[in-house]
C-alpha cells in the first residue's frame, strides 16, 4: 500500500468520498501552502485558477472527462426523479424520500450495484442462471436489479457460471453451497451478523423508540446537504436539480428537527444569492409552510422582524443572541460518520436498518469520548483520539492542550485567502493559542488548524460554537467568511453558516456504529521512510481513507478498503482494524499527523507522530507505543502530551532554521515551563538521545525562551540524573558539549557544581544507597574534577562528600575513591633509580603541563616511562648490571652472607674467661 501526494491521485475522490474527481477542483500541486503564515502561493503562474474552465481547453483528456462527468450527473438526476416519484406514489415516509436524494438505490448489504431504470430498458434483462433466460422486464424491480427470476431466487440450487450456487436472501447474490447452513436461505456470514444484532439490544433504542432511526436519518440528510453544497459550487452543477434536491432535503430536516432549521434556512436563502432560481425558493417556502400547517403554535415572522435564532437539532430551542446567560442545550442527533457511498455512477447507498450499538465496543467508545454523557466543558476528552489527552500537572502548563479546528469553505480557492488570514484567526481566538499550524486540501477548501491553547478557551469555543462562529463573522468582513456556505467543526461540535449568518449548530453523537477512529499509530517515531500500521475502529469501511499530513503535504492512502468483502460480518460493527500505510517523509525532523477521512468526507480522527533523522531518538520514543494502547489512563494522557509538546518544539526548531533571524518574535519562543516538562519526562525514562536532542535545541538561539545558562541553573540536570541513579544519563551529561557559534562548550555539567543548599552531585551520590555506579561515573569525568572535589567540595554546612559517605556508613564509596586516589600519584610520579637529577628536573619541566601546577589532573602522554627512559639513555649495547635494581639486591645479599661466613670461620679470642674459641671444640648434646 503506497501513498502519494493528494493532488496526484487520479480518479480518487477529493471531497467527501463522492464519485469521480471534480473537474473544476484546484490541484494541491499547483499551490505552496505556508502552514505557519497561512499564505498560499501559486506555483504555476502561467495557468489560470483551477476553477476557470478556460485553463483546460487545450487538454483533450480533461475535456473528455468533463463530458463523461456531465453525463453521469444527468443520469443521477433522472434516477433521483424516478426514485422520488416512486416514493410519492407508494406514500413512503420522509426518511426514504430523503435518503434517495443522492440518486442511489438503497437495499441490503452486498447488493450488486446497478442503476435504477427510469424508462424502457435498452435491452432485455434475463436471469443470470445458466440455461434459464427468463425475461425480467415485467417482474418486480428487485428481481430486475439482481438479474434473477423469482423461481431461482428461492431455489436451493442453481447453476451460475458453471458452478452450483444458491441465492442469498440477505446478500442478494449467489454464493457457493458451502457458504450455507442446511435449510437456511441466507449465507452463514450474513446470518451470523444478523443474529448478533438481534441478540444485542440497544438500551437507547428500547427507551427512545425510534431515536436510533431518527439519528441515522438525520446523519444521511446532513451528509447529503454537504454533497449538495459542494455540487452547487461546481461549474458542472445542475443548479435547478440541486435546488430541487435541497428543497426535499429541507422538507425532511423540518419534519425531523422542527421548524427552526427550515425557517432559518428559507429566510437566508431568500435573502442570499447562493441559489439563482428565486421561483424554486418560493416553492421551498410553500413546501415548508405545508409541512408546518398542522402545528397550531407556529408564529410567522419575516426574517427582518424575527430576532436571530440559533438552531439546535431535535430540540427546537430558540435563543436571542445577546442573551448568553442561559445554558445551551444540545442534543446529539447528527452524525457525519454514517455510511455514504457514491464511488461511481453505478453505486447504490447500502443501507439496512440501524443495528444496535455493540455492547462489546461500547465501553471502548466511552473511553474514547466521555463527552457522550457530559458537556464539552466538563470533560477532558473529545472526539479525536489524539487530542483527547489532557496535559498532566507535571507539565507546569496544566490547563493547555492541543486540538484542531476544521473549516470547509464552499466555492472557495486558495487565491481567495486574504493576506491577513492568520491575524484574523488569532483575533477570533483572542490570541490565546501558543502554537498554531495549518493545512489545506481540496474539497472546495478544507482548512485544518492544529493549535495549542488553554483549556478555558477550548471550553468557551465548544460550549457555544454558534456564538464563536458568529464572532468570527462579525470581526471580519472578508468574503472568505461572509459569502456563501461555511462549515466549522471543533471536536464533536459542528456549525453551518450561510452569507455571514449561522444557520445550524449541533453535536455529533459518537455512539454510532459507523464512527471511524484512530486508536494508535506504529511506529510512533520514524525517519525518512516509514511503514505505518494504523490501529483503529472501522478503518476499512467504504468511503474511508487515511491521510498523512506532514508540513503542509498530504499523502493519501490508496485502496483503503482492500480486502473489505472478505471480513467476517461478525466484525463489521465497531471492530478493531489494522491498516498499513507506506510513505516517505518530506522533512528530516518535525511532526506529522495521521488522519482518517470518513464517509462524511471530513477527517474525524487524528494521531500525531514524530519525524527525526536520528534512529536512536526514534527507538526511545517508540517505547511509548505500548503505553498509548491503554487509552484513557493517566500514563497514556501524559505520553500523548509529550508527543504533542516535543512535536511543537521540533516544529519551532525546524521553522527557525528556515526563517531569518529578523523574523523571530520573542513572544513566540518556547516557554521554559513546557521545556522543563519535556526534560523531566525524558529524565524519568532515561532517554539519553532525546535528552541530548533537547539540550542541543536549548542552545539554539530563538527557540527556547530563557538563556541556556539560566535554564541549566534552574533545571539542575546532573543533580536530577544522580537522584534517578542513572549512570548512562550521568555519563552523557558529563561528556555533553554543544557547539555554539563554531565554538565547542565543554564542562557544562560538573560533579562539583553547587545546587540548592550547596549540595553537589557528589554529595547526593554519597548520601544515597546503591550509588556505586553513579559515584564511579562522577569521579571519572573528563576534567577529573570529581575526584578532587570528593574531599574539598563543601555544602552550606561545611560537610564534604566524604563526610556524607562516612556519616551514612557508605565505606565502600570511600574505598572506591581512595583506590582511585592511590593509583593517581603512582601513575604520574614514578622515578627510575640512578637517573641524574639535573636531567630529571629538566625533563619533567619539559613534560609538565600548565594544569600540573594547580591541580592533580592526569595529563596524557604519548609513551610510557620505560620507553621514554630508553630513548634518552641508550648509548651503547652493553649496559651495566648496576642499573638493574634486582641484581643489586642479589649482590648485596650475597655480600652479607659471605661476611657472616667469614666471621664465623675465624678464630675469635675471648680474654679472661674461656680458652680461645674454635668451632672444632664445640660440643653438642646435653651437659
Curated annotation (Swiss-Prot):
In the UniProt record, the signal sequence range is: none
- Tree of life domain: Eukaryota
Motif Bipartite nuclear localization signal at which residues? 184-200
Show the ranges annotated as biased composition (Low complexity).
371-399
The record's remark on the cofactor is: Binds 2 Zn(2+) ions per subunit.
Domain comment as written in the entry = The SBP-type zinc finger is required for the binding to DNA.
The protein in question is named: Squamosa promoter-binding-like protein 12
Read off the lineage from the record. Eukaryota, Viridiplantae, Streptophyta, Embryophyta, Tracheophyta
State the gene name recorded for this protein: SPL12
Amino acid at each position: 500500500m503506497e501513498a502519494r501526494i493528494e493532488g496526484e491521485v487520479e480518479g480518487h475522490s477529493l471531497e467527501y468520498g463522492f464519485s469521480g474527481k471534480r473537474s473544476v477542483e484546484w490541484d494541491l500541486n499547483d499551490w505552496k501552502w505556508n502552514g505557519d503564515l497561512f499564505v498560499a502561493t501559486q506555483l504555476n503562474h502561467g495557468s489560470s485558477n483551477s476553477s476557470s474552465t478556460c485553463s483546460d481547453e487545450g487538454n483533450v483528456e480533461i475535456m473528455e472527462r468533463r463530458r463523461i462527468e456531465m453525463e453521469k450527473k444527468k443520469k443521477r438526476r433522472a434516477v433521483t426523479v424516478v426514485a422520488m416519484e416512486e416514493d410519492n406514489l407508494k406514500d413512503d415516509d420522509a426518511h426514504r424520500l430523503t435518503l434517495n436524494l443522492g440518486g442511489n438505490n438503497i437495499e441490503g448489504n452486498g447488493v450488486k450495484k446497478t442503476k435504477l431504470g427510469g424508462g424502457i430498458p435498452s435491452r432485455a434483462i434475463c436471469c443470470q442462471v445458466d440455461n434459464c433466460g427468463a425475461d425480467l422486464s415485467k417482474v418486480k424491480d428487485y428481481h430486475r436489479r439482481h438479474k434473477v427470476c423469482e423461481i431461482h431466487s428461492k431455489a436451493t440450487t442453481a447453476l451460475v457460471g458453471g458452478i452450483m450456487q444458491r441465492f442469498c436472501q440477505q446478500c442478494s447474490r449467489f454464493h457457493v453451497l458451502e457458504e450455507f447452513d442446511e435449510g437456511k436461505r441466507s449465507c452463514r456470514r450474513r446470518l451470523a451478523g444478523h443474529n448478533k444484532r438481534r441478540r444485542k439490544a440497544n438500551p437507547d433504542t428500547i427507551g427512545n423508540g425510534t431515536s436510533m432511526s431518527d439519528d441515522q436519518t438525520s446523519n444521511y440528510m446532513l451528509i447529503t446537504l454537504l454533497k449538495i453544497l459542494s455540487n452547487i459550487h461546481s461549474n458542472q452543477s445542475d443548479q435547478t436539480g440541486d435546488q430541487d434536491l435541497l428543497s426535499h432535503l429541507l422538507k425532511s430536516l423540518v419534519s425531523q428537527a422542527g421548524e427552526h432549521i427550515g425557517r432559518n434556512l428559507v429566510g437566508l436563502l431568500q435573502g442570499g444569492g447562493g441559489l439563482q432560481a428565486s421561483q424554486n425558493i418560493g416553492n421551498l417556502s410553500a413546501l415548508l409552510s405545508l409541512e408546518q400547517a398542522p402545528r397550531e403554535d407556529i408564529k410567522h415572522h419575516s426574517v427582518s422582524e424575527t430576532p436571530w435564532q440559533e438552531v439546535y437539532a431535535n430540540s427546537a430551542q430558540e435563543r436571542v443572541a445577546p442573551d448568553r446567560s442561559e445554558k445551551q442545550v444540545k442534543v446529539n442527533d447528527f452524525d457525519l460518520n454514517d455510511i455514504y457511498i457514491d464511488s461511481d455512477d453505478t453505486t447504490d447507498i447500502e443501507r439496512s436498518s440501524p443495528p444496535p450499538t455493540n455492547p462489546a465496543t461500547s465501553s471502548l467508545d466511552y473511553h474514547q469520548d466521555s463527552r457522550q454523557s457530559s458537556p464539552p466543558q466538563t470533560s477532558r476528552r473529545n472526539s479525536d483520539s489524539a487530542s483527547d489527552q489532557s496535559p498532566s500537572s507535571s507539565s507546569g502548563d496544566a490547563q493547555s492542550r492541543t486540538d484542531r479546528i476544521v473549516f470547509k469553505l464552499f466555492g472557495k480557492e486558495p487565491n481567495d485567502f486574504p493576506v491577513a488570514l492568520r491575524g484574523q484567526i488569532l483575533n477570533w481566538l483572542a490570541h490565546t493559542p501558543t502554537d498554531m499550524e495549518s493545512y489545506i486540501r481540496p474539497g472546495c477548501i478544507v482548512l485544518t488548524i492544529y493549535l495549542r491553547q488553554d483549556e478555558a478557551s477550548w471550553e468557551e469555543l465548544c460550549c457555544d460554537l454558534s456564538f464563536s462562529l458568529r464572532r468570527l463573522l462579525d470581526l471580519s468582513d472578508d468574503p472568505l467568511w461572509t459569502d456563501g456556505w461555511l462549515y466549522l467543526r471543533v471536536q464533536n461540535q459542528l456549525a453551518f453558516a450561510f452569507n455571514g449568518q449561522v444557520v445550524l449548530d449541533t453535536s455529533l453523537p459518537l455512539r454510532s456504529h459507523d464512527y471511524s477512529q484512530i486508536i494508535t499509530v506504529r511506529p510512533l517515531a520514524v525517519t525518512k521512510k516509514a511503514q505505518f500500521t494504523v490501529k483503529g475502529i472501522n478503518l476499512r469501511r467504504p468511503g474511508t481513507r487515511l491521510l498523512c499530513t506532514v508540513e503542509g503535504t498530504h499523502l493519501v492512502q490508496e485502496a483503503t478498503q482492500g480486502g473489505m468483502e472478505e471480513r467476517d460480518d461478525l466484525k463489521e460493527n465497531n471492530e478493531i482494524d489494522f491498516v498499513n500505510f507506506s510513505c516517505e517523509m518530506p522533512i528530516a525532523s518535525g511532526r506529522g499527523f495521521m488522519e482518517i477521512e470518513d464517509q462524511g468526507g471530513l477527517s474525524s480522527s487524528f494521531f500525531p507522530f514524530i519525524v527525526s533523522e536520528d534512529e536512536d531518538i526514534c527507538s526511545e520514543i517508540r517505547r511509548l507505543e505500548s503505553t498509548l494502547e491503554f487509552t484513557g489512563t493517566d500514563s497514556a494522557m501524559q505520553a500523548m502530551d509529550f508527543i504533542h509538546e516535543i512535536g511543537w518544539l521540533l516544529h519551532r526548531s525546524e521553522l527557525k532554521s528556515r526563517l531569518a533571524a529578523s523574523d523571530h518574535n520573542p513572544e513566540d519562543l518556547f516557554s521554559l515551563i513546557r521545556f522543563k516538562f519535556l526534560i523531566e519526562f525524558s529524565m524519568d525514562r532515561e532517554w539519553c538521545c532525546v535528552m541530548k536532542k533537547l539540550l542541543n535545541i536549548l542552545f539554539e538561539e530563538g527557540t527556547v525562551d530563557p538563556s541556556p545558562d539560566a535554564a541549566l541553573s534552574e533545571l539542575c540536570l546532573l543533580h536530577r540524573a544522580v537522584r534517578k541513579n542513572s549512570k548512562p544519563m550521568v555519563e552523557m551529561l558529563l561528556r555533553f558539549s554543544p557547539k555554539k557559534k563554531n565554538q565547542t562548550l565543554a564542562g557544562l555539567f560538573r560533579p562539583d557544581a553547587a545546587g540548592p543548599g550547596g549540595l553537589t552531585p557528589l554529595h547526593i551520590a554519597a548520601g544515597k544507597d546503591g550509588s556505586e555506579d553513579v559515584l564511579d561515573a562522577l569521579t571519572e569525568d573528563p576534567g577529573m574534577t570529581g575526584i578532587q572535589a570528593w574531599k574539598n567540595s563543601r555544602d552550606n554546612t561545611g560537610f564534604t562528600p566524604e563526610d556524607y559517605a562516612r556519616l551514612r556508613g557508605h565505606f565502600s564509596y570511600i574505598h572506591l575513591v581512595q583506590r582511585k586516589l592511590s593509583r593517581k600519584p603512582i601513575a604520574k610520579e614514578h622515578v627510575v633509580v640512578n637517573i641524574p637529577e639535573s636531567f630529571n628536573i629538566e625533563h619533567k619541566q619539559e613534560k609538565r603541563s600548565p594544569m600540573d601546577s594547580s591541580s592533580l589532573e592526569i595529563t596524557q602522554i604519548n609513551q610510557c616511562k620505560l620507553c621514554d627512559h630508553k630513548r634518552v639513555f641508550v648509548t651503547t649495547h652493553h649496559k651495566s648490571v648496576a642499573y638493574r635494581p634486582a641484581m643489586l639486591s642479589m649482590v648485596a645479599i650475597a655480600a652479607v652472607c659471605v661476611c657472616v661466613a667469614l666471621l664465623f670461620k675465624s678464630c675469635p679470642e675471648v680474654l679472661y674467661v674461656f680458652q680461645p674459641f674454635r668451632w672444632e671444640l664445640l660440643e653438642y648434646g646435653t651437659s
